[in-house]
Regions:
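Predominant activation on well-ordered alpha-helical scaffold segments within soluble catalytic domains
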Residues: 63, 78-85, 119-126, 154-161, ...
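Hydrophobic alpha-helical bundle architecture
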Residues: 160-167, 171-173, 183-237
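Alpha-helix capping and helix-loop boundary segments enriched in small/acidic/polar residues
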Residues: 112, 116, 144, 148, ...
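Acidic-glycine-rich active-site phosphate/pyrophosphate-binding loop
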Residues: 116-135, 168-185, 231-233
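Signature of multi-pass transmembrane helix bundles
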Residues: 2-135
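Short glycine-rich or small-residue beta-strand-to-loop segments that form or flank ligand, phosphate
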Residues: 1, 139-143, 206-208
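Conserved phosphate/anionic-ligand binding catalytic regions in large, soluble enzymes, centered on
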Residues: 137-155, 196-200
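Short coil/turn segments at secondary-structure junctions
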Residues: 68, 140-141, 165, 189
Length: 237
């Protein structure tokens, strides 16, 4: 096996047998068979030969696009906000996983941490992850193939925008800036980097929030530097 990413599964049930192989990327099936009958077989060269080349992104290009693209072209990001905030609201009203988000909104925790904008961002982001990791029947919008990364790139920015009364246009641009920054960083890490992906997504959020605070390109770039300086090296299990 020469693939960086390779998953092979054999299942038997009710006297029947199925096989599946994923290789090259997380959603790329290269072999499927059922009861000995091959449904799909493209195992030769399963890796990256068929993949489209990455768009040569830079932070400057990401920033300029997020701030200058016609606002209607960015409407797709509204769905990320709707889905991921809905997941947070669901978890805040129920018991999911470790209930970290709900706990952070408890009376004792509010007394200690206060009902600040920062604590709300923490609670809502944690709550959405609680719901997802507990298997709640609620969809979330991913980033770079990860639901938690999608949450971390969306919810802090959405909460900040809502609490500060940001306009719909600025909110939309901030969310696009956040998600594209995360994608830009992720391009350099490969599919199976040991670096925690939520660190990358949080770096994207810092850019979106910096923009909502009135920052320009310099401030956004400094936000990236601050995040990378503090969090690089956090390993994912």
């Amino acid at each position: 096996i020469s693939e960086t990413l390779y998953v092979e599964v054999h299942c038997t049930a009710g006297g029947r047998r199925a096989e599946a192989v994923i290789a090259g990327s997380h959603t790329r099936f290269v072999y499927l068979a059922c009861d000995g009958e091959v449904v799909l077989d493209r195992r030769t060269g399963a890796s990256s030969r068929e993949e489209e080349p990455c768009v040569p992104l830079t932070l400057r290009r990401v920033f300029d696009y997020a701030l200058t693209a016609p606002i209607d072209e960015l409407a797709f990001i509204d769905e990320a906000r709707r889905l991921n905030m809905a997941a947070a609201e669901l978890a805040l009203g129920g018991e999911y996983g470790h209930s970290l988000g709900r706990t952070l909104r408890g009376r004792r925790e509010l007394h200690v941490m206060g009902d600040s904008l920062f604590s709300r961002m923490l609670a809502y982001t944690s709550a959405a992850c609680d719901a997802r990791m507990a298997g709640a029947m609620v969809p979330v919008m991913s980033n770079s193939g990860s639901g938690n990364q999608g949450i971390a790139a969306t919810v802090p920015v959405a909460v900040y925008a809502r609490q500060t009364g940001a306009s719909e246009e600025r909110t939309r641009r901030a969310l696009v800036l956040s998600h594209l920054t995360a994608i830009y960083i992720k391009q350099s890490l490969g599919r199976l980097s040991a670096l925690c992906g939520c660190v990358v997504a949080a770096t994207g959020s810092s850019c979106g929030i910096a923009y909502l605070m009135g920052g320009g390109y310099r401030e956004v770039a400094c936000a990236v530097q601050n995040m990378i300086a503090n969090l690089t090296g956090m390993i994912c299990d």
